């Protein structure tokens, strides 16, 4: 099968995500954290995405060693997540989340940069590659939801093991090639440093339209972060357990499949701004349905995951890959 490693890499990344993102706030709540503390802990990953993630992306682009950087991040995540078992106080959990976020925040953009580029080179529809991640996420989150009620720490051990497997799969990506800037710097010696630095400070994208695209992405991320941060806590307050959380997250993942099957047709028919406007509207409706506190309406809200998050994610990733300045693909995706 052409590009099998790309399907496996994307699938394994979303398996690692399924063993952390859906259940972590429920873990915080069970450890006695209040809403304010959960909000602080949940904000660390987005903060790392704004501050640390661009540094990792710049390192990957300037050296051209994206695969090596991704492998390093995976190994660091595998080690950092093992800090969680045994934590009890807010300070201990804060330290574990901070350490994990420093590395985890940069994994997806660099992984996407590599996988999307390879998919285009091999003539593979990225929607099909991403669908492998969706199915993997749905299967794992459903099974783990029923098991984690009595074995909560298993999510951390499983996450660590999956990051190690993810690392092995990343070794199947083509070997890193030094960027033209790095080659030029080696050829010309230390005096080329200032030239390279000036070149690195240039624009990341070829069009200013990216700012409008990023505005939509910001609105979507605002909603999705709020949703993911407090859904688990909300279910606990209503008297439900991890099993329902797993079912709801499985529904949301499966709702992405029809979108991925149709996204190329939709992209050809409608402009990016039209699709993103509809996606943000679906996210707003999703939050309204969730607030009802009714399981049936919660399930309906989860069915909007595909029309909201997946549309926004796919449009942004593919648009950025087209409009990013050559040599800055990791920074663009970050």
Kindly give the residue locations of the regions a language model identified:
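Helix-loop boundary and gating motifs at the non-cytosolic
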Residues: 1-46, 209-248
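Symmetry-related core transmembrane helices of the 12-TM Major Facilitator Superfamily/SLC fold
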Residues: 140, 155-172
